[in-house]
Regions:
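Secretory/organelle targeting and membrane-embedding segments
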Residues: 1-50, 54-395
């Protein structure tokens, strides 16, 4: 049928296979393509797109990579992450590497800490079967949030081409500090939502969802303090938060710059969050810079103000859907925004020990939180002196 269509419309022999299927089909489909001869061509290209999850641990990720590479070349394997198709995420590279005012400050000397937040008001819906075998750590942290962190933490690439950029992303994952068992208890919070109220509506708890065990210990919330063992970021923590059934749906990155060494003015922010660069990924893709200014009138009282930019203000045209951009890149052969095998394996090397620790501990350390609120346990992750103390309202 494919050959008939190509001949009918005089199309080149270029085919993209997009595996938006259950993970258990990730081996069956490539082997089937190989068996029927569709995986090869002498006059065009064959590319395959793989949705997450790309494996469930380091062993399965390596196995899937070996299988795909036995049929396709690595540069024809596209591991898709729709977060990287969002305009704001792509603009992190431009913001950092085309503006001289930011890059000189983008290091441990001037940045106190970084927060990466992805929260949802929805529960798991009809995905109980999938979520019971996955959880927030595999579903969100191993791919989406670590990828966002890599864009923030990576070194400048030697050139703006796919391999140079993916080289730097892989280096970030390889520099992830691996937790000791003691650090896992101190620097990671896992939680599960219970019944509660969101936007005035009562919602059920995770264990009451369809296809979920009544005594499940699967996490629907993860908060982590992550450190990178490299020159640029040594001593600067990255805090990652993600969860379902929280009070607000948003994904954003907050860069907290260090405060001045001395507080000279009344009302001056005294925490380490006085100057923030906020990159809003969704909804309403935007960038905001927060800083202190004098309130009009006598004296030198300071208020925090915000300089905002909305991507929608650049054009009346609707921003392209993340998948639209990413699938176009596949057709063009541009793998910049796709994960490479070594980066995937490095991220699984970081995640695997955490999963094994949780399996061993079962419900020990699992925090329960009412839908619409965060687990109380997250307060121990971030020291009080790193929390924003900007008590004056934004102007």
């Amino acid at each position: 049928r494919v050959e008939e269509l190509q001949n009918l419309y005089s199309l080149p022999d270029n085919i993209v296979f997009y595996m938006a299927t259950p993970p258990e089909m990730y081996e069956v489909i490539p082997l089937g393509l190989q068996k029927c001869g569709l995986a090869y061509t002498s006059d065009g290209f064959r590319r395959i797109v793989v949705e997450k999850p790309f494996g469930t641990d380091i062993k399965s990720a390596k196995h899937l990579t070996r299988l795909l590479e036995s049929i396709f070349d690595e540069h024809d394997i596209y591991r898709i992450d729709h977060y990287l198709g969002k305009e704001t995420v792509q603009n992190i590279l431009v913001l950092r590497f085309s503006n001289g005012i930011f890059e000189p400050l983008w290091n441990r000397n001037y940045i106190d800490h970084v927060e990466i937040v992805s929260s949802e008001t929805l529960g798991i819906g009809n995905r109980g079967g999938y979520y019971e075998s996955s959880g927030a750590l595999r579903d969100m942290v191993q791919n989406h949030l670590l990828q966002l962190m890599a864009f923030i933490a990576m070194e400048p690439p030697v050139a703006f081409d796919p391999e140079s950029i993916r080289d730097e992303i892989a280096k970030v994952f390889k520099s992830l500090h691996h937790y000791t068992p003691e650090e896992m208890q101190e620097q990671i919070v896992r939680g599960q939502y219970t019944a509660g109220t969101i936007a005035g509506e009562s919602v059920q708890g995770y264990r009451d969802e369809k296809n979920v065990s009544g005594d499940s210990v699967r996490e629907t919330y993860v908060a982590m303090k992550i450190e990178l063992d490299n020159w640029r970021w040594a001593g600067t923590p990255f805090y990652i938060y993600t969860g379902k059934r929280l009070s607000e749906k948003k994904t954003e990155i907050i860069i907290h710059f260090k405060s001045t060494p001395q507080q000279l003015f009344v009302g001056q922010c005294s925490g380490s969050s006085c100057n923030q660069l906020i990159i809003r990924v969704q909804p309403n893709e935007s960038i905001a810079l927060r800083f202190g200014l004098k309130i009009p009138g006598s004296g030198f009282e300071v208020r925090q103000v915000s300089m905002d930019f909305l991507y929608s203000s650049l054009s009346d045209k609707k921003l392209p859907d993340a998948y639209e951009r990413l699938l176009l890149d596949v057709m063009l052969g541009d793998s910049t925004l796709y994960s490479r095998a070594d980066a995937q394996e490095a991220s699984w090397n970081f995640i695997d020990p955490i999963i094994k620790n949780w399996v061993k501990r079962r419900k020990d350390g699992l925090a329960f939180y009412a839908s619409g609120s965060d687990p109380e346990e997250i307060d121990r992750l971030m020291p009080h002196d790193k929390k924003c103390n900007c008590c004056n309202e934004m102007m």
